[in-house]
Curated annotation (Swiss-Prot):
Residues 1-83 form the 2Fe-2S ferredoxin-type domain. Belongs to the complex I 75 kDa subunit family. SMART domains: Molybdop_Fe4S4 (SM00926), NADH-G_4Fe-4S_3 (SM00929). Residues 83-122 form the 4Fe-4S His(Cys)3-ligated-type domain. Composed of 13 different subunits. Subunits NuoCD, E, F, and G constitute the peripheral sector of the complex. This is NADH-quinone oxidoreductase subunit G. It comes from Buchnera aphidicola subsp. Baizongia pistaciae (strain Bp). [4Fe-4S] cluster 1 binds at H99, C103, C106, C112. It catalyses: a quinone + NADH + 5 H(+)(in) = a quinol + NAD(+) + 4 H(+)(out). One of its GO terms (cellular component) is membrane.
Amino acid sequence: MTIIFVDNEEYNVDKSDNLLQACLSSGINIPYFCWHPVLGSIGSCRQCAVTIYKDLEDKVGQLVMSCMTSVLDGMIVSTSDKISRNFRKGIIELLMLNHPHDCPICEEGGSCHLQDMTVMAGHTVRRYRFTKRTHKNQYLGHFITHEMNRCISCYRCVRYYKDYSGGTDLGVFGISNNVYFGRYNDGCLESEFSGNLVEVCPTGVFTDKTYSKKYSRKWDMQYAPSICQHCCVGCNISVGEKYGKISRIENRYHNAINHYFLCDLGRFSYDYSNVDERLTYSIYRSQNKTKIINDVNKTIDKLAMKFKKSSKIIGIGSCRASVESNFSLQKLVGSENFYLGISQKEYDCLMLIKDILKDNQIHVPTLREIEKSDVIFLLGEDVTKTSPLIALSIRQSIKGQVKTQDVSKNIPIWHADAVKNSFRNNKNKLFITNLMNSSLDDIADESYYASTFDQVLLGAEVYKCISNNCISNVTLLKQDLLSCAKRIATALTLSKCPLIISGSHSYNLDLIKVSFNIAKSLKVIGKNVGLILLSSNVNSIGVSLLEGISIEKVINKVLLKQIDKIIVLENDLYRYLPESIVDTLFKSSSCTVVIDHLNTRTLKQADIAIPTCNSFESSGTVVNYEGRAQRFFKTYHPNSSENKKSILESWKWLHLLYCKLHKISVFWHSLDDVIEEISLKIFSFSKLKDVAPNSSFKIFGQKLARSHHRASGRTALYSNINIHEPRPPQDNDTMFSFSMEGCQNVQNYLPYVPFSWFPGWNSVQSWNTYKKINNENYGKHLFQDTTKFVLTYYKLNCKNVNKIEDLYLIVPCYFLFCNNELAQYSPVIQENVLKNAYGIINTEDAKVLLIESGSKIEFSYLNKNFSIKVQLSKEFKKGQLGLPLGMADFPFFLAEKQVKVFRKISI
C-alpha cells in the first residue's frame, strides 16, 4: 500500500494499480472508456485525464492519462482542476459527434456507461450540426443485437473477444475516423462467451436480444443474487424480473469464480422459466380423467389420501434441485428409499469424485487459481462445452508466465500492450486428450484424439513416467504415444503449479482414477498441484453427500414388486432410462407423483403433477465442483402476480405432506429451519448455516432491497386487474425484501448485492468503483481439512469395450446448449439451436455407410428407433458414434451401447 493525495485528500491505495483504478476504488469519480479491470489499459480513449504535480510548489502540473500512469508514493493529483475538466469534457464531445443520441429507444438506457460518463464529464450541450457517419448493422445471431452507429471506438469489444476469450470471428475494420467493429460478414458469433460483449461494451452497440423482447429499464426491475444452474462451476449471477417474468441475467462479481464474465449458456438460457406451457396448478389424473386442483391444502389432502397406508414409497431426487429439496424428499421416504436420480455410470463417477473431495489430499483450485497454473493436463473433458468458464480460465493460464516476468522486466501488469508483447514467445503448457478436436486446441501444445480407453492408457503412462510405478498394462501404446506421455510427464514434473482436469462426462471411472493418481504422484514429489473433477449438474456434489442410490436400482424393486408409490423430484426419468423401463416403472406404481417446474415427459405421465418453484422463484443451496456451498435467492414470489397460482418450493410441498402423514404441526416455517435440521443431521453439511446470513439479517434495521430506489409504478403494476394496492409479498426465507423499501447501502456486503449500482454509476461498470472486492470466501467449503497424508493410489481396470463388428459404439459428445436440460426448454434455444443438433461419425465410416456431412441416419436400440443428422470428423475414432446425450430422444443410458446404423434418411 502507498499514500497518494487526490484533490487535497489523502488516500491509501494499492501500489500495483494504475492511477485510475486506485482512484476509482477510493470512491473518486474519473470518467473512462477503454480501461477494464481485467483487460487492462491501452490509453486509447483519452477520457481519464487528470493533472499530476511534482510537489506542493508546482502550480501548473502535467496532464496525464490516469489509466496509463503508475501510482507513486506521495503523488499529488487533481481531478477537478480546470485544465483536466475541460480536457475530459472536450474528449467526450468528440466521442459523441457521430453518436445517434437515441437513449430513449436504446436497451442500455438507464444502465449505460456512456450516459454516466457524459454526465460525469459535464457534456450537456450538443454543438455538432453536421451529417453524422452511419454504418450498416450486422446479424450476429439469436442472442446479440448489433447497432454500430452507437460505437465510440473504445476497442473494448475486440480486446475482450480476441485477446481475452480467444474468439476469431469478430474484429475491427477500417481506418481513422471510420472504423467498424463486427464480423467479416453476417452470421452467429462463434465464441461461447460472446454474451459478455453486452456488458463489456460501454455503449449500446451490442445488446441482449433476449432482453429486448421483454424490456424494462433497470430501475423498474426486481433483482436478486443467484447462482447459475447450468453446470457445476456455480457462477454468481444477478437475475432481473418484471411482471412475473425473468427479463435478463447479469454477471455478479465473485473474486474466486466467475469474476467479470459469464458463458452464453448461463446468460441466455433463462427463458425456460417464462414459457406459457409451464404448469401453475396441480393436476390429478385418474381413470382417463383429469382434474385441476388450484389449492395447496386440497393438493396436500389428495396426496395424503393416496399415501396414507402405503409403506412401499420411494423418492427419486435430482441434481438440479437444491440440497434442501432433496433432503426433504429423503426425510419423507427414508434414506433407504431415496434415489439420486442419475444413471449407474454417473453415480459411480460421482461417488468416486465425492470420496476424492472428502479425502482432501489434493487442492481443488478455483477459477482464479486455474489462471496461475503453469502446466495443465486436460483428460477427457471438453470443458468449453461442459464447464465453459473453466475453459476461459485455462486460456488466461496460458498467459501466466507474463505475470511472473513482468516484475523483472518492470512491466506493470495493467499495461495491456506491453504485457501482450512480453507474452508472445512465452506461454504456459496445455495438454489435451479428447474424443475429437475442441475449442482449446488452438492454445494446446499437444492434443491427443482417441477413445476414452486409449486416453486412460496415455494417462496411466504419464503416471508411470512421474512415479515409476506401473499400475496397469500399457504396452498397447505405440512408440509415438509413449514419447507423448514422456513429454507430458516431463512438463508436469518441471512445473511449479501443475493442474489436472477431468470429470464424469465420459462416464469412465478409470479416467478419474488416473487423473487422481497423476495429481497424487506430483504432490509426492513436492509440486503445488491442483486437481479438478467436474460433474454434470449444478448440485451433483451436494446430492452425492445425501448418500442415495442410483436410479437403475429402482428396476430391481419393480421386479420384486417392492414399489407401491413413487415421488419424482424435479427429474425427467426419460433422460436416463429406456422408455420401456420408465413406462413399466409407472405402471407398477399405484400412484406416481411428480414435482417439477419443467413440463417434462415424466410430468405428463404423472398421476399427480405438482408445480414447483424454479431457482428464480425459490431460495436454496447448491454445491459446486470445489465442494463450495452457495446460496441462491428467489427473485420474485410466483404467486404474487395477477394470475392465481398454487406454486410452492419443492421442500415446502414435501414438508407439508410429511406433516400431514405423521399428523403433526408444520415445524419448518422458513428455509432457516430446513438448513438447521440438515446441519444437525448430516455431518457433511455441518457448515451449511454459515453459507449466507439467515432471514433475520438486517442492515440498519432493514432487510436488503431487491428493487432500485428509483423504482417506479410499484403500486400500479396490476391496477388493470385490481385497483386496490396490494401489500408487497413477505419473504420469510431470506434477508431480502420484495420492494424498493429496504437498505440500499450494501457496499460492505458485496456477496449479497442484488444489482450493481453506485452513485453516479448506473451500469455494470459500477463494480469497478467498489473498493477491492474480496468475496473469495463467499459460500462455504464443506469438506474438512485432513490432518494425515495417506499415500494411496487407485488401481485401474483398463478394460476396453468388447467391440462387435459392424456395430457402432455410442459415446457422449457435448455441445454448449444441446445437452443441458434447462436450456432445452428455453424457446430461443429450441428455435435456433436444438433443431440444428447433430451427431459425430468418422469420415472413413461415413464412406462405408455412403453418407455425407449433414445426412440424417437412423439406428435402433431396445426396439426404439433413433435418428439424427451427423457431421464428419477425421479425428473421431472409427467405429464410434457421438451423440448429444441428454438431449430429447437421446437418453444417457445409450452411453457405451453398441448399435447398427441401418439406413440413411432422405431430408
